[in-house]
Each structure stands twice: as C-alpha cells, then as structure tokens.
Amino acid sequence: MNAPRQSGSGKSAPRNRPEAISQARKAAFNVLLAVERGQSHSDDLLRGKTVDSLSAPDRNLATALVLGVLRWQIRLDHQIQALLKHPNAKLDPEIQITLRLGAFQILHMDRIPARAAIDESVELAKQAGHRFASGMVNAVLRKLASRAQPAEAVSALKGHGFSRAAERTYGDGASQAAEKLDPEGGGGFNPRIKPTESTPALVAEGSFTRISSKTPSFFAACLAPEGSLPEESPADLALAQAHPAWLVERWAALYGFEAARALCHHGQIQPVLTIHLQDPSAAEELAAAGIQLQPGELLACARAVVSGDVTGSAAFRGGRLRLQDEGSQLIAELAAANPAQRILDSCAAPGNKTLILAERNPSARILACESSPQRFEALRERLTPFGDRVECRLADATTLAEDSAFDLVLADVPCSGTGTLGRNPEIRHRLRLEDLARQTERQLALLLAALRAVRPGGRVVYSTCSLEPEENEQVVAAALAHTPEVSQISLESGIETLLSQGLLGNSGADRLRHCLDPNGALRLLPGAFATDGFYVCLLERESQ
C-alpha cells in the first residue's frame, strides 16, 4: 500500500508573511522542480535564460541553492522526514523541494537568517498552489532551525569532512562553473543507453574486485579528510555525506573505507574552477582586471581561479582561455603526446579535448564525431576557427566507415560520471547499479570501433570520468580479448613526453607516475588532485 500523501498540517499559516519571494529562490525552486520531474539537467537549466537573466548576486545564490540542495538532498530528506507527523508520508514534489530549499539554507548557509529561509519557504509553498501545506512547511522548518543552528550543524558536519571554506565558495562565483563548464565525455551519464546485441555483457552484481590493493598508498595520504571517523560503517558514511548507500559500499570495497570517505567528502564541495590558457599573456590581462589566479597543480597551461569573474573577461570572450578541469586537460595532453597526422575524436563534444589536439598537432587533420544533434551544433561552432583542418561530423562513431585510417583515436566515452559528483551532484540521484551494464555495453562498442579505425602501429586513448572498474579496466580487458593484435602500453612514456615539452613539471610527473596501475593506466581520484575523477589508458595496434 502506498504511503499517505502529506500535504499539510490542517492549520493555516501565519498571516504576516511577505508576499514577495526573492528571484534567486524562485529560480532555484523552478530548476529543482524540473530536475525532480526528470524534465532536464541542472547544468542545462542553470545556463538557461531564467537564471542567466538574474543579477550576478541572485545568479550566484540561485546556483548555490540548486547545487547545494542536490549535493545534500539525501541527508536533507532524512532530516525532514524525522520531523513530519507521518515520517513515511509521500510529499508532493513542490512541497518536497520547498522543504529541501529551506532546510539547506538553515543548515548550510549561515549568512542567511533562519527566519528569512522559513518565511520565503512558506511563501513558495503558497505560490506553488499548496496554501494549506504552508503551515506544515513553517512547523517543520521551525523545528529544524531550533534543533540545529547553522554553527552547530557545520560543527557536526566537520567530523565528516565538510569544511566551512568549501561551503563559502557556494556564494562566490559559483555560477561561473555552472553556466560555462560543459560536461566532458560525450555527455556523461545517459540512463537511456540500451545494450547492444553485438557486445557481451560485462557487469554482474558483485563481479568487481578490490582495486585498493593495486592503488598506491599515495592516495590514502592525499584523500583522507580531517576528522575521519574509522568506526563508521559505509551506510553511516553514505547518510552523513548524502551519497547513495550502494555506491559508498562499492567504493569502500574497491578503494578502502578511508578513500571512500574522501571521495564522498569531495563530492560535497564546490570543485576548483580551472582554466586552460591558450595564450599565456591572457593571465596578465586577467590579473590587471582583478581576477586572481594560481598555477595549476600539474600542467603549465592550467590555472585555478581564486577570485573574480573569468567568464565576463575579454580574454574569455575572445577565446584566449576556456574553462576546463585540469584532469580533462591532462587526458587531451596525454593523447596529443602521440605524434599523429590523422586524428579521430570519437565522442568530441563539447570540444575541449579536440581543441587541445588541434593546438598540439598543427599539421594534423582531425575528425570530430558527435552523435547528439544538440551537442553537435555547439561543437561545430566551437571548432569553426580551424577551418577544413578539423571536420565535424554528426555521426555515431561505431558506424564510421574509415577502418585503419587514423594514427590516433581519442575515445573519451560517455560514462556514469561518478568521478564528477561534486560538479554534477544530481548523478547520484539518477544512477542505479543496473545502469552500469548499459553504459559498459556502449563503451565497449565505442572502444572496439576506435580500435578498428586506427591504422597498424597507431594508438587509441580510452578515457572516462568514472570511478567504476566496469567502465574502465573491465571494458579495456574485454576489448583486448576481442583484438589480439592490440596491446596496452604504459602512459609513463606520455608523462615523460609532457615533461620534456615543458607542459608538465617534475613534481607533477612524479605524482602521476605514482598513480599508474600495473598495466600503465592512469586513475585520478578526486582529492588526490584538485580534479574530477578520471581513468585513462593507452592501447596500440601492432604494426604489420
């Protein structure tokens, strides 16, 4: 039997409420409601007209509210349900969103008075057509505010790796990343991917093996947040850090409990906003405009944005820099370290990696494929400056007729995106274990197509932004089993090439060497570096 639907307490809300709701909260409510109903993704909505038309302060607040609620939704729902008259009641979506918004402001945003958060939440409920539920909203949020003041809430969360410094970044330019940093890897998690009949099933529940025995102890020191509590269970950690229990249990089994704790911690903070500088002089121009940068952690062309509006700068508008995670930059640089005259980027949108391939190989001809019509149009526009040297093609890379035609193929495939939960928090609410099977079928098909497309002696770079072995090592192993003429080679040679070219420093090279697995693949875990999580490996087709 379905749980009763709770729409209100039966009491009318107090009459002395403001009739106006801030534009930021109204926009955040509409975005979250659309996400809840599965109508769109938060990153698309935060780049849309409704949010873009807001003033800069309201845009930052709306972005902070949306991303914050999505990050903490699992824990917020648990806290809200405990205060309901009927804890197992199913709330209307509008009331659920209203309560989450109010609870997030009370517990995680100490610059916002609890009274303001409560009052505007009550008004949101009324304007959403749930006037009689406004009394319940008022009562629940009042109880929440009285039981956990912001300072107390933050203090409690510090034990789980939550930092006030990270929370503060929500309201300081957070909308830059949400508006401009496009997803990598062919669009990220796609629950609509269907398995193909031509590729074997790779995933069975419990089929993964522990990776932590092959993961250098280097990760443990880099990943462990302050205030770790070794007595916690994965279920406790999942609730404290608002992650799905099944995912945390997997990470604990794969990487060890402390690494799982750190991965959860880094999924709860605003990621570093990083730029790729095509023109080094742009850094001086940004500094003159009051935009503060610091050197990237690994690459000479990377800069982390400390403060200031990069996306409003002339350098950004003129294409002299672009927003791109440093791990994403590294994948493209490692691919470009292999000299090539004909290059295929099989899942090219949004084009950041294609741009690096074109810049590092000025005489190469590049084919950039994208199967999504919407993403293809943006890709084609972005790559127009390269003229005929870069061909953009709306095509599924598994259907290309060009066999043995390319010196280098970059297969940066669509994936679950579990390495990007800090940047794409809603993934945790949509992803299911069975979705991994659909992803891996598609990934294997794309990798096998890439291996067909590369000439004898040519190379394929396979990459994902996933932390899951089914999408990484297991896909590569299955592809190698199908192609005995292909072998996996270590990325250490690529690291050495970047070092010799001055694109990578000695310290960064040493750290990356420590992250190579026994087969020479590279895994970046969030927290070990100031990057999203990535997996990348290098395959070579033997010469005839």
PLM region spans:
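S-adenosylmethionine
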Residues: 1-176, 180-182, 189-544
